[in-house]
Every structure is written in C-alpha cells, then in structure tokens.
Amino acid sequence: MDKIWLILTREYTSRVKKKSFLLATFLTPLLMGGLYAAAIYFAVSDSEEKIIKVIDESGLFVDKLEGRNSVVFEFVTEPVDSARKKVENGSFIGLLYIKDVDIDDPQGINYYSMTTPGIDLIRGMNRSLETVVRDAKIKKMGFSKSALDSLNTDINITSINLSGENEKEGNSGIAMAVGIFSGMLIYMFMLIYGSQVMRGVMQEKTSKIVEILVSSVRPFHLMMGKILGIAAVGLTQFILWIVLTVSIISIAGPLLGGESAEDMVAAQSGIAQAELAQSPEAQNKLLAAIDEVVDSVNIPLLVGSFFFYFLSGYLFYAALFAMIGAVVDSEADTQQFMMPIMLPLIASMMFLGVIIKDPSGPIAFWMSIIPFFSPIIMMIRIPFDVPLWQLVLSMTLMVLGFLGTTWMAGRVYRIGILMHGAKVNYKVMFKWLMMKN
Amino acid sequence: MDILNAQGITKRYANHLALSNLDLAIPNASIFGLLGPNGAGKTTFLRIINQIIFADEGTITIENRPLSQNHIEMIGYLPEERGLYKKMKVGEHLLYFARLKGLNRTEAIKRIKVWFKKFDIPDWLDKKVEDLSKGMQQKVQFIATVLHEPKLIILDEPFSGFDPINANLIKDEILELREKGSSIIFSTHRMESVEELCDHIALINEGVKILDGPKRDIKNQFRDNIYSLEHLTPIKELPDGFEIKTSQKIDEGMTETIIHIADNQKANDLLQVLIGQTEVRSFSEVIPSINDIFIKTVKEQAHG
C-alpha cells in the first residue's frame, strides 16, 4: 500500500505542477464565464428593433398588424417600385407588400429584402398576418370576439411526485437540466482523465521506465497508483473549476445582469450597477430559483450518487484505458482499441434525448443498470426519481463492473507492458488475460 | 556461501521454451557473468529473479530463503530496456526510485548527495532529465540501481550504449561494490566486454546451461597447450612432441608461428630449442577467449 501511495503522489504532483494543468484549471472558468457573458450580450443586443416597411393595398392590415420577436411594422404609402428601390439601396431593411387580397384565399403577399430572411422572421410575419385575417373572418361570420376568446382555456398541470416522504411539486425542467449537467460532467471526466491514464501508461512503456518500476512494485500496484493519482488530479481540477466558476459568476453575473434588458432604463439613468445587483428584487428571484431546485430534487441523493458514479465510472473506464495503454507501442495504435470503449460512451450521449423523454422507460432502465452506460444514464434519471431497487442494482453492478475491468486490465497490463513490437490484437489480449503468472 | 541459488528453473512461452531446467549458484561477493547470444534466455532469468515474471518450475533461494517480495529491497536491477521520466528532475527521480525500493526520504537524499560528489556532478539535483545527454542519463540510471545498497546487483547489457569513459567509470564502481560485499550479475551477449571483470561465468544457449564455474577453471579446462611465438629467422626443425600448426610472416622479417606442445612436454624445453634456432621476440600461451570457448562448446554439443 505504501508503494501505491508513492506512485499516486508522483502521478499527482508531476501533473499538478505542469503548466498545462494550471492553464486549463484557471482558463476554463474564465472561458465559461466569457461564454456566459457573450450569451447574455447577444441576447441583449439581439433585442434591437427590426423595422419592416409595409405597403398594404388591401387596407385590411393597417394599424392591426402586430410585430413579433422585436419586429416592428411601419406602414408606408408609396408605389411598390420606388419602395423596392429603397430596399435595394439599403434605406429599407425589408419590405412587406400586401396586394388587395381576398381574405378567404390570401395569395400574393411578398417580402422583399437584400438577404434571405431567417425562418423565425418569416414565421413571425406569417403569424402576425394570420391573426389579423382570423380576426377579420370572425367579424365577417358575426361571432363576438370575446365569446370566442372564452373558448380558450389555459390549463397548467402541476405534477406531484408521491414517491418521496412528502408530496412535492416536481419540476421536470429543472430535473432535466440537473440530470443532463451531471451526466455530461461524468462523461467529460471519464473521457479526459481516462485517456490521460492511457497516455501515461503508454509513455512509461515506450520510454522503457516500466521494467525498472516493476522490479520494485507489482504491476497491479503500479497501475492502481496511476489510476488513483490521475483521479486525484481530476478531482482537484473539478473542485477548482467549481469554486472559480461560482466566484466568477457571482462577481460578474450581477454586473452583466444589470445590463440586461430588465432595467436598462434604470442603468441609463445613472444608478450604479452594483447597487442594482443588490436590489432585493434580483436577490429574491435568485433565491426563488434556488428554492425551486432544492424542493424538486433530492439533493443529498443527487450529490451522493453523483460522487459514486463519478468515481466508479472513472475507475471502470480508466482500467480499460490503462489496458489499451499497456498493449500498444505508439499513439497511432490506440485508435483501433479506443473504438469499442468510446462506443458505449457515445451511445449514452446519443440516447440522452430518449432517456429524458421517458426517464422510466425500458431503454432508460436497461441502460441505467449496465455499467458501460449507467454512470451517465443513471445520473440523468436520478433527478426524475428512480425506484430504490433499481438504484441499488445499478450501483452493485457498477461496483462489480469496475472490479471486473480492473482485474481484467491488471492481467493484460502485467504482460503487455513488457512486450515491445508484438503485434497485438484482441486474440492476443485474450491470451494474455488467460495467461497464468 | 551463495547469495542466490536457482534450481531447475523452467519457463515456457506460447511457442518456445525460454529456460529449461536451469541450475545456477551465484557466490557471495563475486562478479558473475551470465553469457549467451541474443535469445538465450538471459533476460527471462533476470526477470524471474526480479519477480517480474514467474518460473513455471523450479525454485530460487536468496540467502537460503525462498524468493519473496521481501527480497525486492536487496536487489538492484538495471534492465536492458531502461528509461527515465523525461520531465522529472534528476534529484526527484532518484529519490522516487530509492523510495520505491524502501529507502526513507532523508537517507535517500543523503546517499544521492554522496553519489553526486563521487561522480563529480553536484549541480544535477535540479536538472531535468530531458536536459541530460545520453551518457549523463546512464550515470543517473546506474546511481538509481545501486542507491539502496543492494546486496545483489543485476545488470543486463550494462555497457550497451555507454561510451568508453562511462564504461570504465562504471567498471570501477562495480569492482568497488564487490569489495564492499555485493554480488553482481552481468548479463551480456558481448562476451569480450565483461571477460576481464568476471570471477564466475555461466554460458547459456537456447535456454540451456552449457558451462558454469569460476572463470579460471573454465579457461584452464579449455587450454590447448598452444603457444604463440614471434621470431626473426625461420625455425628449422622441432623435436618430437612439438608441432608447428601455422607459420606466417607478419612484417619486416618478423614471423608468427603457432606451436602445439604435447601433454608430456614443457613450454620451457620448447623455448630452449627455439633460442638455439632463431631470435625470439615474444613467446606466450594462447588462452582461448570466452567467445572461443562458447563457440567451441556449442559446436561440440551440436555434433555430440
């Protein structure tokens, strides 16, 4: 055990001291913060008004046409030809030309612009026009509009989850977000640090340090020391990311929030942005959102299972990655062996949509108990509440799974690391697996 | 007494027999040459001693106790395939290897400094391995092998890739380690390179031991009573019991003649006869090299 610890510390310190580690650790939160800021910036700047000129020969739409998605209609009364020229020379952004139409069969409405309009813009204009036509038809048929409006009823289903100790209001939106986020984190962790294990093992093999090492430690200890050391690096990086991202967002968030559309007027009238951030209204909103998450998701269960699947999933895959590193002689050879390992990971991502649509369905069930998929899929399911027996089954299989891959990897590893220039395929790997000491 | 005793070691790989019923005894405080061509099974045997792989049959004892994990700390192994972590500092590297061999931190640092002084490289502690030349890296590897003062030092092809200066430096250290009581196993296919160093020799070929014993005994065993003579004027005739094998001019009137002496004759008698006939410039016994012995033995085995 002392030796595993020695190897673990070497792996950990040599990686944590690297410049690339420091760079990735401190730049990633900045990058995330930057993306967050950019998203807000574009959301705000996108809300600029888009003025579209309208020539309405039917007279049906004047002053009734309402713009959507920051589109504003301005009616003009000039000949179509001269208006089109104005579009061509850029004084008008867009021109909507409505001929004298029959409301039962409105044909020949044209939109002129110098760029191809986006689908949202066309759809928005269609809706605006349709609403006006509909109102005109209602009038023509002699219904009163208010009577018709009363036919529309707003229904909101409140979903109540009875599986917990207390009835609680479920919020599938938040559950979904939490599930996807934790599943993605685990996916990234397994992939990034798993392949680091592979590369580390391969480097020890190709630089021929390994024979000196295995004359001092057992190959299995060497492999475990490396896997655990890199896990510690990963955990350090994740914790730093979380701490840094949270602090960046909590400093920068309110500043950016102040610029957002909510209170631009206030900002312009000279109220300091910092004060805005502390306004009770904004704080209440944040608290309400946090409350909602806390209420709708079982936090201790979520955090507990997150750490469980985070670590067990990593151990499961890292062992397989270590095995690949031990059998190949160069980076190029890794490709053929990577594929079968990547496949279940990619599949988990591909089935994400299906799982979210039906988090208790058969696909979700099977994928969440098979160790190849369960670290990602079960994490996505947990916020939607999973029966206890399924969770226990999944975790048991996961533990057996990583014990299995570690055992298997250890056996292939001890032979593979000493083999240079051997042509390795699955048959050879199987032979090594079965070989006695 | 023997530090290591191997009995009936057999190791099979999928398609060949790497070692077949090998018996070897490594005497205490000696330098033992494990010689044989590539693929003879030398590295397999060394890996078995280091418990990197395990024998299918046979037993190994070290100081009369069966080989176990406890012995790791008393063995120093420099494999043929050896490397260093390029990004690590030399000091950290040596410390890591020493601690893997069970040395504690303070003792390891103390000894690293002693070795650095010895090799006259005091400023290497903070140097990165990748900044060292190949020869420098070899020194570091050697220090790493012996830092924990192992009683049994195993060197597999130790001089491959060494320049002559480093090779001599290492040779001197090896002799000193033997003086201090360590036993050294040398494994190489370049037999001439270790001939002068070894006290004991074992020759193996295709997994089978073909010769084993103190170097002097082996050499005596293979003496053929052949003498080499360098002289000026030609030799006329030799009495019974002396036979000229070959005679050829080498340069400036000098001739080299190889003479076989029968078992009942003496070299001194030959010399007396020769002095009467020609001017003798040199006279020496032709002692077979280990390489010659190896080739001869392998041939004999193939025919017999």
Which role fits each region the language model picked out?
Chain B
Residues 9, 97-98, 218, 274, ...:
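Broad structural signal for hydrophobic residues in well-ordered alpha-helices, predominantly aliphatic
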Residues 172-258:
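ABC transporter nucleotide-binding domain
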Residues 70, 219-220, 267:
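A short local loop/turn or secondary-structure capping micro-motif enriched for an aromatic residue
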Residues 2-6, 11-205, 211:
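ABC transporter nucleotide-binding domains
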Residues 224-300, 304:
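Short, charged/small-residue-rich alpha-helical element at the C-terminal edge
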Residues 10, 68, 91, 191, ...:
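Alpha-helix N-cap/helix-start and coil->helix boundary motif
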